[in-house]
């Protein structure tokens, strides 16, 4: 896949709406207002060239130019000038990154063909694959690092990560506070009653006679949606950061973020055919009624038409493969693979639609039902103590806490919840040594990270096609969700895991331009997970038995591993060019959507794995340092194809090329370009020779789709 993106932007800013439009009440009741626009020339390079020191890659203060890894940084000014509203828009200025398309919720990015992670001030956050939209407005800078994290940060995914640096009153380059209070107030309105109010203020202050800085940011949104039945978005965000100089030796940095989000995921269209894509022609029709007790919902038990304990609308057609040639048989042959004398393999009559017709589908009509919901409450806190000793040693104690409470319900047949929290305690001891020919920076870092999780999924009898999108969700398609009765879950995991790690990093730079960066880390992880059997559906898509004999009830295990990295680079004098080579092996924990570990992965040791990276590249600054470029060629691979989480951490091998240019032509004009070529291979699918997939209408060209849209055929 190739991606070529060119950014060519004259930058200007628009004044806010009139003061009356900034009243609090407008957040909830948007009114019509005339927008007054002024054009204002912005001077400088828009803070879009990577000149600042960034410690989110290796833990040392190096600029992106000097860092021997493929990485990009996006400043607050750059996000403002390019009008970036959510995390997905960061891909415009970062090669190797892609939107996840996770049911319309911008929780994270795919980096180098696999799901990426998010970090907050250099500490890994809980997984967020569509749990809630990750906010970017409260960030001073976002660093996008491609490939696994450095050993100093602990186990990490293979693809890469985004590190969010919250707005602060302390100037990162100098360590001083901003000279005076500064703030901003803005209100945004638009189509579909878009209503967003943001406010921020920060500056210097004193507490107990000690100098300090503060920065507060708040955001409120109450917006409708283009899509029918969608609840829109209601969210509130509060972020605070504080810096206190206790004395000349010790400083405190503490703060946090609270984010409350309510919306809905969007599964898009169903009953997909080529005619729908080409001409907008949608197959209408009603699924067979299954709600036998008349409560308006179809329970798992009501999907068991013949009463044998197994669903009858989700057969696994092992003799048909959407990965191979199109199935060319007839409907009768499809339903009777053993021949007419053997009887039907499954009952196709209950899957056929009734009152079939066609219609032109309004693009605003999707699978969202009126009572669908996605609710997430996340709290993030940090408290750092930094001591700069007279001997030159710097000791940093970082304490981090994050929790989220998530509920996700979709009428077509999917629900989940998770209640998870993580606490990380990290000590970093470092010093810079300077000699006649070189300087050396070292970091030693023991750490402890504890994660506690409770997570449940409900995806058995998940039927996308039963709903006729020309009308609302009804008792013909709406399923009784496990989260509403707290029973009949497909998977349910309760447990915890604790990672004890120790890392050492060294950054060696000779004054002739040669630089070596190396590090090693050891992790020992205690993990346990269990399933409450009384809350599970039997049989289900995860447990293929009706008596519970197939359930992995509980497991505990101890795993350990070593991570390392080695980079060498050379700053070629008077050229502005820095070629580099990086080799690394990084541990990873195979956690799911709610940070959970499955019982089977814990029992088998498959909850822990390593990844390998080989990367070659060259970076440079030319034209009086107004043009920055970066070129990298890489190959990275998860080492154990059997250890994976399908949604969040798959066993993948990727290789490719990434290229980035940012050119500040003059004080008004910025030109940027990114290029990505990536090939991703799922190692588990290659090893198994197949991969489970839902079979669509295009895979069975000789069978009328309306004969199957009342259920869902699976295959491999």
How should these model regions be labeled?
Residues 236-443, 450-451, 628:
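Outer-membrane beta-barrel domain signature, strongest for Gram-negative TonB-dependent receptors
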Residues 1-84, 88-96:
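N-terminal Sec signal peptide and the immediately downstream disordered periplasmic leader
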Residues 377-404, 417-536, 569, 573:
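Face-selective signature of the C-terminal outer-membrane beta-barrel domain
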Residues 512, 626, 630-637, 650-716:
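Gram-negative outer-membrane beta-barrel transporters
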